[in-house]
From Swiss-Prot:
Function: Tropomyosin, in association with the troponin complex, plays a central role in the calcium dependent regulation of muscle contraction.
Pfam families: Tropomyosin
Protein name: Tropomyosin
Subunit structure: Homodimer.
Organism listed in the record: Metapenaeus ensis
Lineage, highest ranks first: Eukaryota, Metazoa, Ecdysozoa, Arthropoda, Crustacea
Domain comment (free text): The molecule is in a coiled coil structure that is formed by 2 polypeptide chains. The sequence exhibits a prominent seven-residues periodicity.
Composition-biased stretches (Basic and acidic residues): 1-35
Keyword presence, Repeat: yes
Family stated for the protein in its record: Belongs to the tropomyosin family.
Coiled coil regions, renumbered to chain: 1-274
Amino acid sequence: MKLEKDNAMDRADTLEQQNKEANNRAEKSEEEVHNLQKRMQQLENDLDQVQESLLKANNQLVEKDKALSNAEGEVAALNRRIQLLEEDLERSEERLNTATTKLAEASQAADESERMRKVLENRSLSDEERMDALENQLKEARFLAEEADRKYDEVARKLAMVEADLERAEERAETGESKIVELEEELRVVGNNLKSLEVSEEKANQREEAYKEQIKTLTNKLKAAEARAEFAERSVQKLQKEVDRLEDELVNEKEKYKSITDELDQTFSELSGY
């Protein structure tokens, strides 16, 4: 009986020990479950933050795409404006070439008038012969002016007026020498003015070539800007300022061209006044 009691007590101790171990394992499991729950909550919070960041990044990407599309549109518009500027410069160059040709014709007419003056200097000829030679030279100058652009029609009419004045001068043969001297001096001044105008035309052509080269350089910069899309907006603003500057310079060149043309008209007007 005692043995059974001892055995029962041993089993009771064993069961009690096992119960304690089971309780310890249960507490440890509960702690692990609690830690896992905390970690799950943290992961959920992290997931929310990541999703929010992803949404924000997607929105920023959409905005960047819109900005890039707008920048590409502005670049395309600037390319078109540059093409129009190049075409405008080509037309200006053609007009300058035409003006240079007409200036050369006018210079040739002045040379013919100079040759006429030298003929008149020959004292061995009579006043009538000198006036006839002057009339013939002025007729040649008139023929050259009629072959020029419509803009020089007025010059031809003024030369005809000079021709009429010279015909009337035949009636004043004895006083014609002083008139011839004045005409010689005026022709010399006109020759100098024409040479100055030729130099001005040459400089204007050089400036046109320089501006054309600048626009080619600007076109290359625009192509480079397309490859650097992330800097497109800043590049577009910079190129816009450059295009505006070139447009202003082109307007100035057109004004200078008009000034040269007006000066040429004034020179012929002064020549015809005599």
